[in-house]
Design a protein with these regions (language model features):
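Ligand-binding loop in jelly-roll beta-barrel domains
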Residues: 114-133
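Non-catalytic, conserved peripheral segments adjacent to functional cores
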Residues: 1-104, 108, 126, 133-179
Length: 179
């Protein structure tokens, strides 16, 4: 595994390494020692998986308010996504900026620090995404940002066509509560 820093502090793309032989392959997908060396949270409390049927489905932008902010480790088990992370930390140099990373099956993952919103658009049909979380889910602290907020100026690789009602009702980023 190799960690690559991104412009948002604490955000890393993690390149995966497959060890192949005639039986197939072996690949490490979580290495807490490596995360500890970079002082990244890895006290994983729960693990989720989502299945998305259609290419062009957008999920997000989701985050939780204090004290339930969470770090996430996001991995694509099948398919590929455009993963987008927005820095919501008011004191951050990259406040309200975003990073877009193409995450593909067996190639890479993303470590997302606390205080960031997260969303993704599927680039293929039948995607499976898994997530590690380091804090409990608290429905009353769940928040979101509208996926098509003009201020973000996101360049989607695939135009989002399928968005659920909840995600489509979030407010523009200019209305979010600052951390």
């Amino acid at each position: 595994m190799k960690l690559i820093k991104k412009k948002i502090k604490g955000l890393f793309e993690i390149k995966l390494k497959k060890k192949k032989d005639k039986r197939g392959y072996f690949m490490r997908v979580c290495d807490n020692d490596l995360l500890n060396k970079k002082k990244l949270s890895n006290n994983w409390i729960h693990f989720n998986e989502s299945f998305t049927k259609k290419k062009g489905t957008f999920r997000g932008f989701h985050y939780q308010e204090k004290p339930y902010q969470e770090s996430k480790l996001v991995r694509v088990v099948k398919g590929s996504i455009q993963d987008i992370i927005i820095d919501l930390r008011k004191k951050s140099k990259t406040y309200l900026s975003h990073v877009s990373i193409i995450v593909s099956e067996g190639k890479n993952m993303v470590f997302i620090p606390k205080g960031c919103a997260h969303g993704f658009c599927t680039l293929q049909s039948n995607c499976i995404i898994s997530y590690f979380h380091d804090n409990i889910y608290k429905k009353s602290k769940e928040r979101g940002i509208l996926w098509k907020s003009k201020k973000l100026k996101i360049k989607f690789k695939v135009k989002p066509k399928y968005i659920n009602k909840k995600d489509s009702k979030y407010k523009d980023i200019s209305f979010i509560k600052k951390f």
